[in-house]
Amino acid sequence: MKITIAKSEKEFDCIAAWQIIGEILNKPEAVIGLSTGRTTGNLHRMVGEIYSCYPFNTSAVTFFGLDEVVNVPREYAGACYTMLKTEIIDALGIKDENFLMLPTVSDDFGKACRKNAFVEKPTPRRRRNWEG
């Protein structure tokens, strides 16, 4: 694990934004997890601002949210889905199928997560015949 210490929040935002961009440039099919909240909004917007000045290919990158609030519509301003969508996803032109988020409303969150590939489906173990 690499820990980066910055002198200010603005410097942190810049470092983190360039790390995200670097990952996309080095691995066009990268899968990147993003958190939400007051501390990450500025860096997400910074990625979008850099992209608008210096566009790069984002067609194969996939983003997923690390967290989500429940029992609110996705359109609610406090939903992590909406925060990421407005802060970075739309700015980078990410397709809906390349933006994975936990559901905000469901009668069965486990089922909804499995449907959306957030929970790895168990695969049956193969029986092997070790006789010789």
What are the residue ranges of the model-derived segments?
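Short beta->alpha linker loops
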Residues: 7, 38, 104-107
